[in-house]
Amino acid sequence: NGFLGVGPDSIQLESLLKKAQKMGKKTGIVVNTTLTEATPGAFYAGVTSRKESYTIAKQFTESGVDVAIGAGLSAFINRPDSVDLTATLIEKGYNVYLDWKSVLKTSSDKFVGILSMGDVHRRNKSSNTTAGAADGAEVCLAAKLAAGSEENADTTRLSEPTVYLEKATAKALEVLSRNNQQGFFLMIESAIIDGYGHNNDSDGMIEEMKEFDCTLKQLVAYVNQHPETLLVVTADHETGGTGVTYNSFEVGNPTPLKLSFSTKGHTGTVVPIFAYGAGAEAFAGIIKNTDLPKKIEELMK
């Protein structure tokens, strides 16, 4: 239906991020797509269409998030109302960085990094920038993949996985942990796994999972060092009907793994949920996806 952060009556719902803020916790968002995409947007915005990136960007400036790192500058500056929302963020006390080096070097406790899509995802180095059909916001290949666009991903050369998500996560953890006795809520999204599922791109999905795995190893290490922390990893849905088909292989002759797909859309397949750290036992068994935020909220109290 395209609704984002609102109920059937179009009234905005209170997200986990907002509830964490009410508890006095710091909050952060790290994504390898635009900050106004559906998943990050759902944690701070309330609109009747996920395509309303200009409205979502405006609501981001009112979100109170302490740290945010992602892409999507166009929705903040190339706007129909001619308002420069980066200036609005600065007026609200944020440091705003538009390049990766500044994000890595900053010692600020409150900042927003709005980077190029080429900075946040390896497959955008040579991709063409196009106009979004809905609102004219700039969208590169990764954003189109995340939105489920049909793209011939096989023609895009794979490079080694970047370390963007891992480093951006490390920076967010550094800032949110600093001088903080109340704890924090951090939402991290590896957005393009879904896009490769839509495109039935086995190589892309495998490489993206490798990069995500590096980020998860870092998060597990953080939990080990801060045992009062809870790490929850899951997905909102499965994409592509992904599987590994039966095959015969010659012993001693390594064969690259190829995933199989049954659709280019989302499926109703049950998705896993992994929890580690304080309160992880609450996530055993089969859980309704609408119960997950309730469990997390209780454990944050």
PLM ranges: what are they?
Residues 10-14, 18-21, 25-39, 60:
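Mobile, glycine-rich extracellular loop/lid and propeptide segments
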Residues 32, 36-301:
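A post-motif C-terminal structural segment
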Residues 4, 27, 268:
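Short glycine-rich loop/turn motifs that provide flexible caps or phosphate-binding loops at active sites
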